[in-house]
């Protein structure tokens, strides 16, 4: 499966412009008009990155991001916002967003960020030299150890 820039924005003009922009730079993309529409097609094995509007009708971009995180998605997320909100940007990045871009944006900078996010995603999915050994060791964990490991990975304390 090829990496794709998954665009979720309720503004049709933005979706069309981003699709055209990415195509002009040879970046495959697909666009959805809402978070709900994206969720219908979402699978845990999607590759690439998610370009996500912060404020949309219905489910917001932040709500979608939180839901995908709860479902274990590791797809890098680049938030787009027409409302330059520094606290919002900081909160999104602290929660694990790959980047936060204000509208209007510089086309080349956005495409470069999307390409970096896609490269980051590909590097995490490529098996490392010790992948088999790591998998074998993880399979030895007890159910309780797996539970603790999952909570630690989400930033919870082990107490």
Model-derived regions, located:
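Short amphipathic alpha-helix used as the core "switch/output" element in two-component signaling
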Residues: 36, 40, 62-74, 91
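Two-component/phosphorelay signaling modules centered on CheY-like receiver
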Residues: 3, 11-30
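The feature encodes the CheY-like receiver
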Residues: 15, 57, 81, 85
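Acidic catalytic/metal-coordinating carboxylates
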Residues: 33-34, 58-64, 84
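Active-site beta3 strand of CheY-like receiver
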Residues: 6, 45-52
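Helix-turn-helix DNA-binding segment
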Residues: 132-159
């Amino acid at each position: 499966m090829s990496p794709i820039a998954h665009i979720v924005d309720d503004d049709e003009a933005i979706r069309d412009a981003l699709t055209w922009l990415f195509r002009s730079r040879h970046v495959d993309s697909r666009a959805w008009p809402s978070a709900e529409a994206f969720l219908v097609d979402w699978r845990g094995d999607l590759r690439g990155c998610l370009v996500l509007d912060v404020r949309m009708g219905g489910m917001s971009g932040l709500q979608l991001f939180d839901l995908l995180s709860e479902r274990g998605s590791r797809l890098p997320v680049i938030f787009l916002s027409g409302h330059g909100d520094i606290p919002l940007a900081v909160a999104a990045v602290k929660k694990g967003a790959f980047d936060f871009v204000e509208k209007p944006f510089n086309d080349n900078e956005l495409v470069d960020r999307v390409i970096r996010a896609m490269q980051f995603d590909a590097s995490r999915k490529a098996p490392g030299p010790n992948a088999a050994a790591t998998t074998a060791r993880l399979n030895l964990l007890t159910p309780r150890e797996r539970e603790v490991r999952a909570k630690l990975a989400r930033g919870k304390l082990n107490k």
